[in-house]
Design a protein with these regions (language model features):
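Conserved donor-binding/catalytic core segment of Leloir-type glycosyltransferases
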Residues: 4, 183-214
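Carbohydrate-associated surface elements
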Residues: 145, 166
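Nucleotide-activated donor-binding/catalytic signature segment of Leloir-type glycosyltransferases, i.e.
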Residues: 241-258
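Short alpha-helical donor nucleotide-sugar binding micro-motif in glycosyltransferases
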Residues: 257-258, 265-270
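Aromatic "clamp/platform" in nucleotide-sugar-dependent glycosyltransferases that forms part
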Residues: 278
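Short hydrophobic beta-strand element within catalytic cores of glycosyltransferases
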Residues: 295-298
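Conserved acidic donor-binding segment of nucleotide-sugar-dependent glycosyltransferases
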Residues: 310-321, 329-334
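A short, well-ordered alpha-helix in the C-terminal region of glycosyltransferases
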Residues: 336-351
Length: 370
């Protein structure tokens, strides 16, 4: 199959969408498909990547004449399907949808974000203005939680499929007998190590995470030692550092951004992984932790609930207090931590493996072409 991916953002940017699209491109090429990418992100020349870049402030990933460029690329490539990737509102990606419809290409559009009420209002207004529901699109969401608000806007005539984000799950699982496997199996000094990984941006509620950790520490018996590591960088880091200083929370560290290998090593010594954001469309970092054998604490209304069941892969809660109680329970109950960790190490989140993801998108491509 000749596939053209369209995404506002792509490598060398390293956000969640950019990395996921790049991994999907790699997996599809390894499966024998011919895959190219069109993006509005500036960067080095890469094989099969078309960069439609305008000289705009802050390297904004948009182009005022993007549709014309996209039409030219689509006309020259003999593609079988256009696969468009959008966040909440992605102007260049939706130019790609419009260009593909005009070119007569089947279109699959993956929504990587959770549509909030404002975003839903925007898409209802766009439907009133342009009638996009009648364009023959197949929409996909990365989780059931993300699909629900999309279905509410798209209506019954627009297919909204759920295709998980992909992960090479075997690469995150500690091998039996390895240092990583031993580190997970043995608690070491007995300190309960709580880990979180993600961009330190307001949408992820990082200050709320610090309050959660502080409250949990207050409720855990004093004879249970705790420490926490929050990996990532972003605009909220300064406020987080001030919070930790003022509250004298020296047991929480902010080491900055980590590579994948560094995150794997960190998870090898983690006892609990926390993903507290309520509007998490998927939660790739939580999936990595689950694949690495770490019990996950997350919101029941987030995309993490697609691969974490209460008491099986971790604990879920709907409120802040629920999450605090879950962290406290896991910190106090080493037997529960151990049983969840063993389950996570011995089973795979099959729906999130690349073979399952490729099969899901192949079905969507067939649906769009029919």
């Amino acid at each position: 199959v000749r596939i053209l991916h369209v995404s506002d953002c792509y490598l060398p940017r390293l956000g969640g969408i950019e990395v996921q699209v790049a991994d999907l491109v790699r997996a599809q090429r390894e499966a024998g498909h011919t895959v190219e990418v069109v993006t509005a992100t500036p960067g080095e020349r890469l094989p099969g990547v078309h960069r439609v870049v305008a000289n705009l402030p802050f390297d904004l990933p948009v182009h005022p004449r993007g549709t014309a460029h996209l039409l030219r690329i689509m006309a020259s490539g003999r593609y079988d399907v256009a696969h468009v990737h959008t966040g909440a509102v992605s102007p260049f990606a939706w130019m790609g949808v419009h260009a593909a419809v005009r070119s007569g290409l089947p279109v699959v559009a993956t929504v990587h974000s959770m549509w909030d009420p404002v975003t839903r209002g925007v898409y209802r207004a766009l439907e009133a203005a342009f009638g996009w529901r009648r364009w023959g699109l197949v929409l996909t969401a990365v989780s059931e939680a993300a699909a629900r608000p999309i279905r509410a806007v798209a209506g019954p005539r627009v297919p909204v499929q759920v295709v998980s984000n992909g992960l090479d799950v075997t690469s995150w699982r500690p091998e039996p007998g390895s240092e990583r496997h031993s580190a997970v199996r043995d608690a070491g000094d007995g300190t309960v190590h709580v880990v979180a990984v993600g961009r330190l941006a307001p949408r992820k509620q990082p200050l709320r995470l610090l309050k959660l950790l502080e409250t949990a520490r207050d409720r855990v018996p004093g004879n249970v030692a705790m420490r926490a590591t929050i990996v990532g960088d972003g605009p909220a880091r300064g406020r987080m550092e001030r919070y930790l200083r003022v509250r004298r929370m020296s047991w929480v560290s902010l080491p900055g951004r980590y590579s994948r290998e560094q995150i794997k090593d960190l998870l090898a010594g983690a006892d609990v992984f926390v993903a507290p954001a309520p509007r998490e469309s998927f939660g790739l970092a939580a999936l990595e932790a689950r694949a690495a054998g770490v019990p996950v604490v997350a919101r029941a209304q987030s995309g993490v609930a697609d691969f974490v069941r209460p008491g099986k892969e971790g604990l879920l809660g709907r409120t802040f207090d629920d999450l605090v109680a879950s962290v406290v329970r896991l910190a106090r109950d080493s037997a529960l931590r151990q049983s969840i960790a063993e389950h996570n190490r011995e089973t795979e989140p099959v729906r999130c493996s690349w073979p399952a993801v490729l099969e899901g998108f192949a079905h969507c491509y067939e649906l769009a072409g029919s």
